């Protein structure tokens, strides 16, 4: 899907996903960029997506995961009891932003045939409130320096498993 096609879908009218009534023409868009390289291809595409969404009058927040402190999930499942992860880092705010968003853009470079570690770590940490983000509209930005189509497809399938 091209950026233009994605933005066309983004501007289509849909019902708001939150209890707060929003203008049907405007959506709350969260972009999660996981590239550790500020001038990398996936981060650059995130910036282009953001520019188009702002131009279309959407509210946009971009989070660069490499700039955040996000610990890996330890599998303790303390979150199942309290609804919040026991770890004190930036992921709690990111998860709140994911819940508040109508649209979530997941962007990653392909490293060693799959999404990069920063994205995988963030996805793993959504376990506390995973069911509150599955009804969102998702877009994927996946870049690779290799022409190996299977690596791109594998990464997209990983995202689809998370978003379905």
Residue ranges of predicted features:
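N-terminal beta1-alpha1-beta2 submodule of the flavodoxin-like/Rossmannoid cofactor-binding fold
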Residues: 7-10, 17-107, 113-129
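Extreme N-terminal basic, low-complexity initiation segments
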Residues: 2-6
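Short glycine-rich anion-binding loops that position phosphate/pyrophosphate groups of nucleotides
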Residues: 110-112, 145-146
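Short, glycine-/small-residue-rich phosphate/pyrophosphate-handling segment
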Residues: 134-164
């Amino acid at each position: 899907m091209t950026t233009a096609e994605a933005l066309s879908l983004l501007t289509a009218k849909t019902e708001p996903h939150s209890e707060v009534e929003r203008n049907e023409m405007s959506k709350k868009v969260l972009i999660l960029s996981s590239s550790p390289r500020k001038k990398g291809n996936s981060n650059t595409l995130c910036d282009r997506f953001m520019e188009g969404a702002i131009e279309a009058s959407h509210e946009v927040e971009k989070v660069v995961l490499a700039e955040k402190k996000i610990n890996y999930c330890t599998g303790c499942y303390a979150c199942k009891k309290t609804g919040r992860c026991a770890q004190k880092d930036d992921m709690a705010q990111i998860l709140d932003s994911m819940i508040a968003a109508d649209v979530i853009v997941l962007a990653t470079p392909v490293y060693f045939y799959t999404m990069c570690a920063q994205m995988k770590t963030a996805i793993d940490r959504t376990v506390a409130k995973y069911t509150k983000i599955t009804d969102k509209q998702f877009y994927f930005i996946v870049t690779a320096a290799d022409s190996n189509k299977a690596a791109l497809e594998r990464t997209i399938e990983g995202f689809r498993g998370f978003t379905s």
